[in-house]
Amino acid sequence: MTVIDFSKSEQYTLSIRLSADGFSFSIYHPQADSDYTYITYPVNKSYSLTANLKEFICATEAFKYSYRKTNILIDTPRFTFVPFELFEDECQDEIFHYNFPPKDNETILCNILGKSNVALLFGVNKHSHQLLHEHFPNARIFSCVSPVLEHFAIKSKEGNCRKLYAHLRRDLLETFVFDKGKLMLCNAFNCKKTADRVYYLLYIWQQQGLSQDKDQHHLSGEIENKEELLAELQKFLRNIFIMPKPNIPFDIQTLLTCE
């Protein structure tokens, strides 16, 4: 981590991450991986998202500068995806509400993911979206899932086997199945117990017809009780790999794949 020279802020990329668990932002130089800073900001859980966001923007000196690019990541479980060849812009709200009931003051946004060949739809609080647009008019807004999905799409082309990727967070398990770059499944489960995670992962493995001997299972994120999780999975699967945990959130780290 390094001190940013804000007189040269237009050479840097600002990435803001908004989650119910807390806010954070990263400033980095696209041509220098080591030239970055990462700052976290706590939220008051008795306040609304928009109220917390107003405080965050006002309290953060770094947001007063102009940047080469500004990215905003929204952490929300309300997301779904559509194969790009079936997607129509004018139907995005209708498609989204096939999967999630309508919610007051929600705006539906879309990320076109070229490497995964899907359109990812996600919901954002309407007032927060307006506030973000006012303060960061040129920002690109992503679901936190989007850069992770694109990163795995690239990695899945390596080798000649299918891959199940599991990204673990405190209360959430995000799963992605790829067949040499082609997305076969994307799903998320609210769970934090090791037994529940093992159940969902093995269920997906079976339902997708993956090979215990040939295909691969990759784990990333906050892997609590890692030894227990590995021991249970290794009873059934041969090729299990754990990705190194980065110093910053995995979705911010992989955001470069959406550049």
Regions found by a protein language model. Give the residues of each.
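Hydrophobic/aromatic-enriched cytosolic interaction surfaces used to assemble or bind macromolecules
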Residues: 1-259
